[in-house]
Amino acid sequence: MAKIEAHRVPGFGAFIRSFGCFSVRRGESDREAVRTMRRIVADGHALGLFVEGTRQRSGVPGSVQPGAAMVAIQEGAPIVPVAILGTQTWSPRHPTPVSIAWGEPLALEGVPKGGKGYKEASAQIEHEIRRLWDWLVALHEQGRPDGVSLPADRR
C-alpha cells in the first residue's frame, strides 16, 4: 500500500503496482483501501504498510495511525513491527545506509474491536517500534566493527 501520489510517479507507479501495491488516499477515510487491506489479510497474505502513514523526515518514529491495528484486530492477524533508521537523509542521488529491525509478531487477540481497542493496539505497536528503533540507534552509536565493510564498499 502506498499513497496515491506515489502511483502517479512515472515508472515508479508501474513498478510498485507490478508487485500488488495499491493506493490509499491519506488524510481521509479511504474505505476502498480498508476493504482491500482486509481482503488481503483475510486471504492469508502479508500486507506491508507504514503504520505511521508516512516517512518520518525527523528521523524518529512518529505516531502510529489506527488503520493497521483495526484491520489486524478485525481479521485476527498479527502485526510484525518494523523499525527503520536512516531514511530521513536517504535519496536516490545521495544514498545513505539504512538499517531495519524486525520484531516478533504482536498478537492482538483480546483487544476489543472499536476505537478504544484500535488506539490501545496502536499504542502497543508504537511502543514496540520505538523499542526496536532505540536498539538500532544504540547499534549505530557503537559503530561498525573493524574489518566489516558495507555492501556498497565491496563493489
Predicted regions and their residues:
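Catalytic core of membrane glycerolipid acyltransferases/transacylases, capturing the structured
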Residues: 1-29, 35-36
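Non-catalytic C-terminal accessory region of glycerolipid acyltransferases
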Residues: 32-155
